[in-house]
């Protein structure tokens, strides 16, 4: 695998996405796809994540974020290219 095969994205998910297990859902998706990064709630009600790994795995994570867990209602997903995280693994962070 070359660096060209690695994608790093900042993902912001809006809608009814807090209080429904959204962060745990994304942690599970990241672990299944062997991705690095983090996820956290935002004070404005959104959920944001930094995710990095093989492009196809990142695409699968974004697809999961677009759907969300049962009980969530996603109204918008914003993607921005990003630098990869400094730590390996995927963490659930405190609200920002």
Residue ranges and their predicted role:
Residues 1-96:
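Intrinsically disordered, low-complexity, mixed-charge
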């Amino acid at each position: 695998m070359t660096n060209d095969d690695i994608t790093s994205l900042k993902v912001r998910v809006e809608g009814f996405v807090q209080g429904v297990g959204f962060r745990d859902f994304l942690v599970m998706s990241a672990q299944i796809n062997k991705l690095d990064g983090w996820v956290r709630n935002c004070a404005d009600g959104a959920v944001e994540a930094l995710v990095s790994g093989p492009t196809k795995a990142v695409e699968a994570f974004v697809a999961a974020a677009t759907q969300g867990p049962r009980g969530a209602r996603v109204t918008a997903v914003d993607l921005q290219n990003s630098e990869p995280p400094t730590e390996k693994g995927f963490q659930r962070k405190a609200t920002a």
